[in-house]
């Protein structure tokens, strides 16, 4: 039996805690930064698929064809809180990047398995409870990862560059856009110019290690 464990990292201007996994995944500005794939039979070999829009920051270790072969031929697709992975796979990997959908009977959710036996659903807490050997929370890596997941307010110099006469307008338009985007909507104005994404090659490589 071929079993793989999958873990997505994504970025989006919408807040998943407010709009939920499916509206988050459906939003046109949500994108996959990377996907970690692990073969259960070879747990020390974690391979990274880097999203097409982020390969200028780090080369992908798994090609699109290799990833398609791995997922299409697996018997179990394992993820913690699998509805998120399923939503990202369906709305981004399939509809945007051309991968094949994963049959529901192949999906295994380890968070559900934790609930079934009375363990915490939170991955870190469940690992602590089980005294999982080798599991150590990488706090620095987690901090770096959080820099990439959402846009930040443009710095004053960039706000002035976007609108030399009224840089405060850029700030107010950014805040207006973020207010709408966070609930999964799309503003009725061209908001992309007001979003400032964090893209640092060194930190992205650190996130891959995380």
Feature roles, as predicted:
Residues 1-31:
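Entry/capping segment at the start of metal-dependent catalytic domains
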């Amino acid at each position: 039996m071929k079993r793989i464990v999958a873990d997505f990292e994504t970025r989006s201007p919408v807040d998943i805690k407010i709009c939920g996994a499916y509206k988050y995944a459906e939003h046109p500005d949500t994108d996959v930064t990377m996907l970690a794939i692990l073969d259960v039979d070879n747990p020390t070999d974690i391979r990274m698929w880097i999203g097409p829009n982020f390969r200028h920051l780090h080369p992908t270790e798994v090609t699109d064809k290799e990833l398609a072969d791995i997922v299409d031929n697996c018997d179990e697709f394992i993820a913690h809180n699998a509805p998120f992975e399923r939503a990202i796979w369906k709305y981004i990997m399939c509809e945007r990047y051309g991968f094949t959908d994963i049959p529901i009977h192949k999906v295994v959710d380890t968070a559900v398995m934790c609930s079934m036996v009375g363990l915490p659903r939170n991955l870190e807490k469940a690992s602590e409870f089980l005294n999982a050997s080798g599991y150590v929370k990488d706090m620095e890596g987690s901090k770096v990862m959080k820099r990439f997941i959402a846009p930040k307010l443009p710095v004053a110099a960039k706000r002035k560059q976007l609108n030399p006469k009224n840089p405060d307008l850029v700030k107010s338009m950014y805040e207006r856009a973020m207010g709408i985007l966070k609930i999964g909507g799309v503003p009725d104005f061209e908001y992309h110019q007001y979003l400032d994404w964090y893209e640092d090659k060194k930190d992205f490589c650190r996130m891959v290690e995380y």
